[in-house]
């Protein structure tokens, strides 16, 4: 086992604080509308330019093991906030640094770290209650656009794109952000349910120019097994032919003789038909087939349920106004499933999302939910260079997450004003002087955001804080973009409550742990072994005459 180095008390906390400061100082320059960029060197390709706090934090690794521990703890604050709220990483980092700094001073002055922690926890709970009381629910598209614009560092177009996407696919819909091949940023909305399986044969195509198969007013047969011959399907095929309507087969696979027979019938014009593979794998495939069945009002043909292909009737088939199939995707628009059944399925998937502990499963369940409840919107990010596209994509991702958070829990005045106002509303009392000191640490830390935003904008922080607090109005604050004072919500400067709340709770949680740390253990660097000397020369070659 390698030797360890141990540091105690004040020495340990000073090292840790230095690490916290290095990381936080690099992250906090990005805060606010006039925050600066950070350039990150990459081992290959062009350097990355970003204003995203968590991207900066993730790149920082310090040489000194003890300093690095402090930095990594604060990095954890940024990552956790990003995971839960999707934004607010810089806010969380600035708050954590402020609480650790103030807490360290109090510990150095001889106060009890555990009582300080209790005081911090009491104050944070009080502030969260105050924030929740003054949060404003958002309902209009304009308010959604405002939140998106703020999170994208004042880019109005991004805010409008996100608002439009949310309007079209609903709050439950999936909105993805991709890199475009052009210089323009555009929004594409896929209505209905889309899954990533295309036609099994190009002969099913009805539009040779676009290479897509469009089927209108279509019957949909859902089968969970492979189809290799059509003998057992003949009764239902004949029934569909009688109606004169097209048929889409969704099965695990359609192969060999079955596929050949379908293609021949399609080419002869006797049968308007297309076949695609079912989406997903294993249990997820079964669940997705069930989703499609509920959306289209059909039944999944499954031997588990005792249904055989021979006994399938027309009323077991799903129906949809339109199905569009490309080489890679199938989109079902306007399925004829009962609204109550779809709502029941949506509620069931929401319950599964609440219960699951796996991020991957949660993501897949959310995709299924979106396909049933709304649709899918894709924001394609354009730009002149790869570096510009990546930077813009980072901002749009942040803005999208912030907007979703705002819809969930509502908004509060932005620019750090909500926390600054809450610092004057903390009414909770500590059980002793040390707990009171913990409460005061939070009071002072809550000013740090407005101070940092003002500093980044080149204004005098103390004057800004003083001016804001002089006026006793909840929404009155400081607009760093224009250096003006006024009603923050009227100016469109808002923050999602979920982001502010999560940032504060995570910052206080990690900062409390750092304050109550008394010892740090790190592995000693391995000593390089001294390099071997030069190999000895050749021994004498006795007995030989030299010519």
Swiss-Prot record:
Pfam family, one: Cpn60_TCP1
Alphabetical keyword list: ATP-binding, Chaperone, Cytoplasm, Isomerase, Nucleotide-binding
InterPro entries per record: Chaperonin_Cpn60_CS, Cpn60/GroEL, Cpn60/GroEL/TCP-1, GroEL-like_apical_dom_sf, GROEL-like_equatorial_sf, TCP-1-like_intermed_sf
GO cellular component, one term: cytoplasm
Any one GO molecular-function label of the UniProt entry: ATP-dependent protein folding chaperone
Keyword Cell inner membrane: no
Catalytic activity: ATP + H2O + a folded polypeptide = ADP + phosphate + an unfolded polypeptide
Enzyme class: isomerase
CDD domains cross-referenced by the UniProt entry: GroEL (cd03344)
Subcellular localization(s) per the UniProt record: Cytoplasm
Binding annotation for ATP: 30-33, 51, 87-91, 415, 495
EC number assigned by the record: 5.6.1.7
GO biological process, alphabetically ordered: protein refolding
Quaternary structure note: Forms a cylinder of 14 subunits composed of two heptameric rings stacked back-to-back. Interacts with the co-chaperonin GroES.
Function in brief: Together with its co-chaperonin GroES, plays an essential role in assisting protein folding. The GroEL-GroES system forms a nano-cage that allows encapsulation of the non-native substrate proteins and provides a physical environment optimized to promote and accelerate protein folding.
Family of the protein in this entry: Belongs to the chaperonin (HSP60) family.
Entry protein name: Chaperonin GroEL
Record organism: Rhizobium leguminosarum bv. trifolii (strain WSM2304)
Lineage: Bacteria, Pseudomonadati, Pseudomonadota, Alphaproteobacteria, Hyphomicrobiales
């Amino acid at each position: 086992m390698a030797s360890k180095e141990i540091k105690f008390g004040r020495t340990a906390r000073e090292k840790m604080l230095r690490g916290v400061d290095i990381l936080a100082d690099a992250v906090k320059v990005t805060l606010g509308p006039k925050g600066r960029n950070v350039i990150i060197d990459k081992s290959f390709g062009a350097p990355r330019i970003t204003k995203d706090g968590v991207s900066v934090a993730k790149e920082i690794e310090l040489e000194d093991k003890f300093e690095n521990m402090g930095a990594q703890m604060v990095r954890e604050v940024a990552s956790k906030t990003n995971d839960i709220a999707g934004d607010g990483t810089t806010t969380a980092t600035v708050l954590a640094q402020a609480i650790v700094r103030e807490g360290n001073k109090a510990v150095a002055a001889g106060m009890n770290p555990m009582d300080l922690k209790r005081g911090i926890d009491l104050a944070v709970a009080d502030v969260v209650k105050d924030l929740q009381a003054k949060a404003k629910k958002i309902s209009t598209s304009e308010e959604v656009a405002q939140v998106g614009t703020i999170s994208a560092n004042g880019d109005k177009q991004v805010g409008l794109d996100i608002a439009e996407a949310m309007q079209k696919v609903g709050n439950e819909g999936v909105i993805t952000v991709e890199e475009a091949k052009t210089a323009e940023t555009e929004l594409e909305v896929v209505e209905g349910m889309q899954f990533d399986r295309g036609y099994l044969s190009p002969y099913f195509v009805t539009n040779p120019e676009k290479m897509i198969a469009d089927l209108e007013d279509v019957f949909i047969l859902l089968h969970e097994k492979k189809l290799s011959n059509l003998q057992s399907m003949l009764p239902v095929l004949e029934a569909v032919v009688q109606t004169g309507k097209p048929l889409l087969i969704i099965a695990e696979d359609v192969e060999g003789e079955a596929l050949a027979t379908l293609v021949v019938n399609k080419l002869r014009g006797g049968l308007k038909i297309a076949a695609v593979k079912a989406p997903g794998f294993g249990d997820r495939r079964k669940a997705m087939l069930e989703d499609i069945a509920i959306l289209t009002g059909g039944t999944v043909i499954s031997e588990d349920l005792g249904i055989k292909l021979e006994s399938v009737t027309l009323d077991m088939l799903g129906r949809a106004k339109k199905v569009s199939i490309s080489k890679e995707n199938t989109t079902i628009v306007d399925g004829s499933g009962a609204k109550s059944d779809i709502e029941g399925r949506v509620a069931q998937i929401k319950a599964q999302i609440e219960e699951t502990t796996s991020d991957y499963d949660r993501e897949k369940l959310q995709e299924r939910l979106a396909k049933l409840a709304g649709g899918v919107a894709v924001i394609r990010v354009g730009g002149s260079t790869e570096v510009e596209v990546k930077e813009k994509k980072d901002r749009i991702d942040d803005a999208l997450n912030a907007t979703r958070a705002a819809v969930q829990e509502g908004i509060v005045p932005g620019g750090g004003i909500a926390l600054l106002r809450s610092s004057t509303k903390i009414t909770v009392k500590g059980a002793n002087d040390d707990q009171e000191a913990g409460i005061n640490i939070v009071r002072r830390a809550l000013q740090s955001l407005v101070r940092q935003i003002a500093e980044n904008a080149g204004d005098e922080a103390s004057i800004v804080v003083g001016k804001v607090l002089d006026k006793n109005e909840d929404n009155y604050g400081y607009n760093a973009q224009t250096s003006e004072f006024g009603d923050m919500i009227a100016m469109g400067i808002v923050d999602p409550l979920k982001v502010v709340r999560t940032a504060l709770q995570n910052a206080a949680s990690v900062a409390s742990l750092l304050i109550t740390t008394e010892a740090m253990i790190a592995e000693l660097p391995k000593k390089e072994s001294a390099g071997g000397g030069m190999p000895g020369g050749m021994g004498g070659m006795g007995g030989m005459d030299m010519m």
